[in-house]
Amino acid sequence: MIINLADVEQLSIKAESVDFQYDMYKKVCEKFTDFEQSVLWQCMEAKKNEALHKHLNEIIKKHLTKSPYQLYRGISKSTKELIKDLQVGEVFSTNRVDSFTTSLHTACSFSYAEYFTETILRLKTDKAFNYSDHISDIILSSPNTEFKYTYEDTDGLDSERTDNLMMIVREQEWMIPIGKYKITSISKEKLHDSFGTFKVYDIEVVE
């Protein structure tokens, strides 16, 4: 389900209904087993487990769809170290499932404020796994017992479900299976008014 940020709270309220949850669960189960749903759920946290990447890779390869032409990734220090000496035309692999976003602001925020690398991967691709869409369905299909309620929930709104959906909708995450990337250009660019200059690696998937 494609969700707009403005619709999150209303959908969260609807998702408190057992009937709504069951209808969404049937929809989700047409695509993913319970185990696969569990793997995707764990990806809302940092994906540091090698076994998780193995299972995740198998899942997303079965569900690749047409993606936006351009995706972005603000890279970690380990990835920056991996590619720092590479030149245009060279190939590299992170040996893991990589998350990208359609949101340039999100990618810049991760690179600038979380990883402190000021380095962006800009990927041109025609297919990827729409994690944001699929995990939104899973969140909406989940029973109320999966989420914490807070004392501020005076209207019965499940704030943790809402918070999770807000995060997912803002990040607009897409995933690329484990594989190789080819560097097509390297540049210094000011990508967003809220940030300074970034080192940008334009890349493409090597089939």
Swiss-Prot record:
Record note on what altering R73A does: Complete loss of enzymatic activity in vitro
Signal sequence, start to end: none
Reaction catalysed by this enzyme: L-arginyl-[protein] + NAD(+) = N(omega)-(ADP-D-ribosyl)-L-arginyl-[protein] + nicotinamide + H(+)
Cellular component, GO annotation: virion component
InterPro entries assigned: ModB-like
Positions bound to NAD(+): R73
Residues annotated as catalytic: E173
Alphabetized UniProt keyword annotations: Glycosyltransferase, Transferase, Virion
Domain of life: Viruses
Entry's EC annotation: 2.-.-.-, 2.4.2.31
Compartments it resides in: Virion
GO molecular function: NAD+-protein-arginine ADP-ribosyltransferase activity
Described function: ADP-ribosyltransferase that regulates transcription by ADP-ribosylation of host ribosomal protein S1. Additional identified targets include proteins involved in either translation or cellular metabolism such as elongation factor-Tu or trigger factor. Also reprograms the host's gene-expression system by RNAylating host ribosomal protein S1. ModB can attach NAD-capped RNAs to target proteins post-transcriptionally resulting in covalent RNA-protein conjugates.
Similarity comment: Belongs to the Tevenvirinae NAD--protein ADP-ribosyltransferase modA family.
Protein name: NAD--protein ADP-ribosyltransferase modB
Native source organism of the sequence: Enterobacteria phage T4 (Bacteriophage T4)
Gene designation per UniProt: modB
